[in-house]
Amino acid sequence: LMRIYGATTIYGSDIALSCYGMMMKIYQIAHSMLVGLSSGTQPINGFNYGAKQYDRVKTTYRYAFIFSFLISIFWFLIYMIFPSYIAKLFVSNSPMYQEFAKLCFRTYMMVFFIYGMPMVTSSFFQAIGKPSKALLLSLSRQAFFLIPLSLILSSQFGLKGALIAAPVADTLTFIVAMILIIYEFRTWKTKGFI
C-alpha cells in the first residue's frame, strides 16, 4: 500500500516505502518489550490460576496492565516527540524523508499508548486456559481490523488512509480486550473467586 499510494503523493513510493520500513524497525523494539512482559507474566498467571490463587492472578494482571501502559506511553512519547531524530539515524540529507517520517510516526502511532494492554490480556487468557479468547485477541489487530481497514481506508483516503488504519485497529482491539477482561473478572466475582 505504501508503494501504490505513496506514488500518488509528493513523497513518491520510494520515500513512503523506506520510511514505513524504518518505522516498523523502531516499532519492533517497543513490540518486543511488550511481548517480553506478556510472556513473563504468563507462567505466574498460569501457576496461580491452577493453585486457585485468583487474587494473585488478578494482581499480576493488574501489574502487567500498568507496566504495559507505562512501556507503551514511553514509546508513544518517543514516536510523537522525536520522529525527525529517529529518521535522521537512517537518512539525514532528505527533507522530504524527514517530513514524511513525522507524518508516518505521528499518524501510525497515534494511539500507541494503548498498544500493550491487549497483548497482556491475550497472554492472560492463554495462561488461564481460555485459548479461544486469547486467539480472538491475537487475531483482532492484524487479521480482523488492520488488514481490512488498510484496504478500505486506503481506497478512500489514499496514503493517509493506509496510515490511519493502525490507530483505528489498535483502538478497536483495545475495546475488545477491555470487554473480554471486564466480563472475565465479573464472572470470577459471581463465582466467588475474588
Tell where the protein language model's regions lie, with residue ranges.
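Alpha-helical transmembrane segments of compact multi-pass small-molecule transporters, enriched
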Residues: 89, 145-146
